[in-house]
A protein has these predicted regions:
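Transmembrane alpha-helix boundary/anchor motif
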Residues: 21, 123, 127-131, 173, ...
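Bilayer-spanning, highly hydrophobic alpha-helical transmembrane segments
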Residues: 92, 98-178, 297-343
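Membrane interface segments of multi-pass transport proteins and intramembrane proteases
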Residues: 137-145, 180-200
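Catalytic metal-binding core of the metallo-beta-lactamase
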Residues: 1-112, 190, 194, 198-313
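Short, charge-rich, low-complexity alpha-helical interaction segments
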Residues: 7, 45, 178-186
Length: 343
């Protein structure tokens, strides 16, 4: 279910409605959305048959539901905490969608600049430079080395653009396939990204923030600590971090603390402030509260770091574009200067 519907469902339940009545009301608002309407109809039918909201969500086949979400709903239904859990789940999914949208919007401007720059450079090299320098070649004048270099690039691009285009898309498809189907490749790439300046910290903040929020949410829902840790580890998208936490989660099931298990385990060691906060939470039995604060801290940190990354990216791209255009302009003007000096 989407974040707005989870919050709406919680408000209906808070007003005294039954789950069935609330689902029917929400279903009536989404009749034009075929897949989502089918999902809601499936829930309504199963609840009418006497199934709980958890069983209906777990049984329906329209959408795949995250395990942590299902288990939180299951425990919340048994403990009478359904309303606050639905609100928290709605807030979580809403914040995740907002972060994704912010990153997408932030990358639009640099991407547009990059595409325009590539297009402009390709046009100059493929069409403008050959026509201008061709005039000087006809005179038998020796062209400057930079002009010869640009002409060589122009000839190469003009003669091989189809192969280059196929190769470009082939690399993208090959990378995506390797990342999806080769766990070894995924681990190597994810490990490399974690070591990248700024980007690595952005990734770790996002991964740890999401883990912290979900673990906090499930503990508030009444899920046992060991079970909550195991479910929360499934939310990691970075293979290196997921492997470290999965190994630690197994030790937690055996009775160890998560902070100790991560400290003694192999693989990626999480950030120091996360480890300190986790250890403090486990010592004081306030894991849910402390990790909830950590999740908010990482969200704010990432917002600031994303702005910094973009502020560095834009001037770098402008400098790169200026350098490329400058080389092309120099390649066109130097033969003219050489001719004037010769005359």
């Amino acid at each position: 279910m989407c974040s707005s519907d989870l919050k709406e469902l919680s408000s209906y339940l808070n007003s005294g409605m039954t789950v069935l009545t609330a689902i029917k009301l929400i279903e009536g608002q989404h009749k034009k959305e075929k897949k989502y309407a089918s999902f809601l109809a499936s829930l309504r039918t199963m609840i009418e048959e006497g199934k709980s909201l958890y069983n209906a969500l777990a049984t329906q086949s329209v959408y795949s539901m995250p395990d942590f979400f299902l288990q939180s709903i299951n425990v919340a239904g048994q403990s009478g905490k359904m309303i606050p859990v639905l609100i928290q789940m709605g807030t979580f999914f809403s914040s995740q969608a907002k972060v994704k949208k912010q990153v997408g919007n932030a990358m639009v401007y640099p991407l547009v600049i990059f595409i325009v720059a590539i297009g402009m450079t390709a046009f100059l090299i493929a069409f403008v430079v050959p026509k201008i320098t061709g005039i000087f070649e006809d005179t038998g004048q020796k062209l400057p080395e930079i002009t010869q270099f640009v002409l060589g690039v122009s000839d190469f691009l003009s003669g091989n653009w189809i192969i280059l285009l196929i190769g470009f898309f082939g690399i993208i498809i090959g990378f995506k396939s390797a990342y999806k189907y080769s766990y070894t490749f995924k681990k190597i790439y994810d490990g490399f990204m974690l070591k990248m300046p700024i980007i690595g910290e952005l990734i770790q903040n996002h991964e740890l923030g999401r883990f912290s929020y979900i673990l906090s949410l499930m503990l508030d829902s009444g899920v046992s600590y060991a079970h909550a840790v195991k479910l929360a580890t499934t939310t990691f998208s970075n293979a290196m971090m997921k492997e470290s936490f999965e190994s630690a989660a197994e030790r937690v099931i055996e009775g160890n603390k998560l902070s100790h298990s991560l400290q003694r385990g192999k693989g990626v060691l999480p950030k120091r402030n996360f480890m300190q906060a986790l250890a403090l939470g486990e010592e004081s039995s306030e894991v849910a509260s402390i990790l909830g604060n950590i999740a908010e801290l990482y969200r704010e940190e990432n917002a600031d770091k994303l702005k910094l990354l973009l502020s560095l990216l834009e001037p770098f791209m402008m400098l790169f574009i200026g350098l490329v255009v400058g080389v092309i302009v120099a390649a066109m003007l130097l033969p003219i200067f050489s001719m004037n000096l010769g005359s």
